[in-house]
């Protein structure tokens, strides 16, 4: 069992400390699915569907700030593969939409609103892409994903969070991708060294559910094996499953950081938990539940 002296040597990095000081921040789920009344898209949606008429980034960010939040994370691309910025690597993006005649950039507008309001800005870029034909090909798809990740990390100012989802289903070719997490991490460290890599990453741990529920004691000092992206991926949501979204912590779920749990562990890390939950029944807005709040 680790001694007290060994335990107190496990401390947060500067980026982790800054992240934890953020405390409370918004996770904006917005994209193609907002206009299809679906939680998850399948990648076959036409960009012509995407045409926001009342999108005002300043209103979003100011509302978050008025709620006491200190930052914003935006779903720049969800599993359907539709990109909210004019990426150079696919036409399945705002460029092919009627919104602003194909000249709009949701990521830029939200990131700039964050600068104006003194709020931190973070990105969500789903590794799963149900639109891209090369998904499941290995290095070819990883190169594509990294090219888009680089665009976001280099074109939108300081990034405080890179939220890496563990969902890994089939692409349009019926294949699954083995994500090259190591290359993804290296890309983030290269272009945004102060950003925390979250969930399937080494900096911030996911609490394990979308119901906003945590263990009675959610320790930050945990075994290093807890940060293996592959194990996090296995426990992540893999289908559009309402039951998964409402799953809560139960007494038989793994104890991660108590003295008993750390007994016999030789490699410990600082890996604080993050909790995310929706104010609506689903993560995205749907017209049939427009007035429903949890």
Over which residues does each language-model region extend?
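Mature catalytic domains of secreted/periplasmic carbohydrate-active enzymes
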Residues: 1-290
């Amino acid at each position: 069992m680790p001694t007290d002296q060994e335990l107190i040597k496990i401390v947060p990095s500067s980026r982790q400390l800054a992240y934890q000081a953020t405390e409370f921040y918004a996770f904006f789920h917005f994209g193609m699915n907002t206009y299809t009344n679906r939680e998850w898209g399948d990648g076959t949606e036409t960009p012509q569907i995407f045409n926001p008429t009342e999108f005002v980034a300043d209103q979003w960010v100011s509302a978050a700030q008025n709620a006491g939040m200190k930052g914003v994370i935006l779903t720049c691309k969800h599993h359907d593969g539709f990109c909210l910025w004019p990426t150079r690597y696919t036409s399945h993006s705002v460029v092919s939409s009627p919104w602003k005649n194909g000249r709009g950039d949701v990521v830029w507008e939200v990131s700039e609103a964050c600068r104006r309001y003194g709020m931190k800005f973070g990105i969500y870029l789903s590794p799963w892409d149900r639109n891209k034909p090369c998904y499941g090909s290995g290095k070819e798809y990883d190169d594509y994903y990294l090219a888009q990740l680089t665009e976001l990390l280099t074109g939108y100012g300081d990034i405080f969070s890179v939220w890496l989802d563990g969902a890994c289903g089939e692409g349009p070719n019926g294949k699954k991708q083995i994500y090259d997490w190591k290359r993804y991490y290296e890309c983030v460290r290269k272009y945004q060294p102060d950003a925390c890599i979250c969930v399937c990453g080494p900096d911030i741990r996911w609490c394990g559910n979308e119901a906003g529920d945590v263990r009675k004691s959610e320790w930050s000092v945990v075994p290093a094996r807890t940060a293996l992206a592959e194990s996090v991926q296995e426990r992540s949501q893999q289908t559009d499953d309402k039951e998964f979204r409402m799953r809560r912590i139960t007494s038989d779920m793994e104890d991660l950081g108590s003295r008993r749990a750390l007994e016999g562990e030789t490699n410990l890390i600082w890996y604080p938990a993050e909790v995310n939950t929706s104010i609506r029944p689903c993560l995205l807005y749907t017209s049939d539940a427009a007035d429903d709040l949890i």
